Amino acid sequence: MESELEFESQAEARSLKWEDRKLRELVTLAWPITVSTLSYSIMTLVDTLLVGHLGPAPLAGVGMGGTAAFAVLCFSFGMIRGVKTLVSQAVGAGRQDLVQAYRSAALQAAVVLGAATVAAGQLLAPLMLHLSATHEAGEATRTYFWIRNLAAPMALVGVALRETRYGEGDARSPMAATIVGNLVNIGLATLFVFVLHWGVAGAASATVIAQTIESGVLWWLGRVNGWRAAGATRQHLGELWRIGLPTALQFMLEVGSFVLLAALISSLSETQMAAHQIALQVCQFSFLPAFAVSEAASVLAGQAVGARRQELVLPVAHLCLRVAGTYTLVCSLVFVFCGRLIAAGFTSDPTLATTAVHLLYVAAVFQTFDGANIAARCILRGVGDVRFAAVVGVVT
């Protein structure tokens, strides 16, 4: 199926406001995306920090349950993220009508996929008991997974609204919603875990409420600022499917393999799983700014293609690689020289801390290379080449 934009291939090239200030535009987009993208990880990180003081079993449960919840969500997440490419190219072409149609298509897909994700998650919840070394850790995993899964529809609606705004070049509205959601999560999680003593269930419930509020705030901002979602047809839904499916399959396979690894680790001991959770949260938290830079570059590349200014794509790609590479190199050095200090923030158990530090040393090795990989794949998605990016992601 051909995109409406493909019928305009002979259209006159359009100027872009950022073509003479690429670095400024990249940073302007990237830092709010960093805050917004950190949302899911920050919420899980808060749960990890709070529950970690209850012992290894609850910590292992949050780690495995949070990973499994994201694994069930990742196909839908990857599918809906395709709207950013479509919208950025529509913005470059000056087609506001297509922006509205793609936003509507993404919201429709979010509702349907969200309901399917909840149904699948509730069926899979009993299996979580068998993904941990002890019965206590298994119960914690099942509880956390089951509750987090309930937020899937609202989380995906938030993704649809957020990715559309990214494509339009607005990263600050999603950031504002993220800040509100995370402040709510911190307050509620502290109340539920330490005051009401709800443990793992309290941490998960706080996150579900916070995710719902975050999506609600973004929806409200859209109403106030006149964002429209209308005009979606089968063609627009088909274009979202065409762009989103390769990325969705890639995410599903990547996260699926990661969950399998986490399940194997969790079957060894609570300490191994807890250490894995600490290292994972630190890596995700530190890596997402580089991911945000790559996402910002993807938006600029998409707008360049839509405006028929393909000569701008390569300079944007080179700039993205330089910025992301420098950042990930600094993170690797921090892991090596400050690993013990980082681990001490999560646990006072010396055995657990030592294991986590060793995992951070491993992360320091691949962090920079992974940053370059993500940057290249995001640029490819921005120009519409989602298949090659997906193949590389699956193979590597």
Residue ranges of each PLM-predicted region?
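Transmembrane helical elements of multi-pass membrane transporters/channels
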Residues: 28-47, 147, 151, 158, ...
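Helix-terminus/linker motif at the lipid-water interface of multi-pass membrane proteins
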Residues: 38, 42-60, 129-135, 191-198, ...
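N-terminal transmembrane alpha-helices
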Residues: 18-49, 53-54, 67-82, 86, ...
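Interfacial/gating helices of multi-pass transporter permease domains
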Residues: 28, 51-70, 136-143, 200-201, ...
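Small-residue-rich hydrophobic transmembrane alpha-helices
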Residues: 59-122, 158-174, 275-333, 337-339, ...
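Transmembrane alpha-helix boundary and packing residues in multipass membrane permease domains
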Residues: 33, 37, 48-49, 66, ...
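Short alpha-helical transmembrane segments in multi-pass integral membrane proteins
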Residues: 1-30, 87-154, 184-187, 193-245, ...
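Small-residue-rich segments of transmembrane alpha-helices in multi-pass membrane proteins
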Residues: 179-187, 396
